[in-house]
UniProtKB/Swiss-Prot annotation:
It comes from Vitis vinifera. One of its GO terms (cellular component) is photosystem I. Belongs to the Ycf4 family. The chain crosses the membrane at residues 22-42, 57-77. GO terms for biological process: photosynthesis. This is Photosystem I assembly protein Ycf4. It is found in: Plastid, Chloroplast thylakoid membrane. Its main location: plastid. HAMAP family: Ycf4. Keywords: Chloroplast, Membrane, Photosynthesis, Plastid, Thylakoid, Transmembrane, Transmembrane helix. PANTHER family: PHOTOSYSTEM I ASSEMBLY PROTEIN YCF4 (PTHR33288:SF4), PTHR33288. Seems to be required for the assembly of the photosystem I complex.
Length: 186
């Protein structure tokens, strides 16, 4: 989502509160809870889950392994729920032509660097760059960067943002026009 006027462009960044993260955290929680209950029921010798009789799964080694997977899954699920509740990765990009300042803000993990805030001068922006990256499945992903003098490139889009090449090109062209800088493609 973005908001634009003649002088200011504000781009809101979603972060970790996406539908897919909610689904994965919920599925992982239920699955790991099931594994832990099956492992515990095999240890106790009682049916805590009515799907499997506890006599079919002996505690050593199947019950121990299922309990371990259940505990590990609960830890990973709690990590996902924490990132969702802290909204890690969300924030905004603000481009202010009137003041000549670019502000990039992101929420991080709790601690000393929870708030990540970058303030840059517009005159230091060299270009808007579109780079092609390949993920582990050999898919090509387009990522939008802002090239800054003396500081390198700052990513403006996430790698999981599924924009078509036309949409990415349109976004880069509009931003480059707004900032009055050239576009580079790598």
């Amino acid at each position: 989502m973005s908001w634009r006027s003649e002088r200011i462009w504000i781009e809101l960044i979603t972060g970790s509160r996406k539908t897919s993260n909610f689904c994965w955290a919920f599925i992982l929680f239920l699955g790991s809870l099931g594994f832990l209950l099956v492992g515990t029921s095999s240890y106790l010798g009682r049916n805590l889950i009515s799907l499997f009789p506890s006599q079919q799964i002996i505690f050593f080694p199947q019950g121990i392994v299922m309990s371990f997977y259940g505990i590990a899954g609960l830890f990973i699920s709690s990590y996902l729920w924490c990132t969702i509740s802290w909204n890690v990765g969300s924030g905004y990009d603000r481009f202010d032509r009137k003041e000549g300042i670019v502000c990039i803000f992101r929420w991080g993990f709790p601690g000393k660097n929870r708030r990540i805030f970058l303030r840059l001068l517009m005159k230091d922006i060299q270009s808007i760059r579109i780079a092609v990256k390949e993920d582990i499945y050999a898919r090509r992903i387009l990522v939008l960067y802002m090239e800054i003098r003396g500081q390198g490139a700052i990513p403006l889009t996430r790698t999981d943002e599924n924009l078509t090449p036309r949409e990415m090109e349109q976004k880069a062209a509009e931003l480059a026009y707004f900032l009055r800088v050239p576009i580079e493609v790598f």
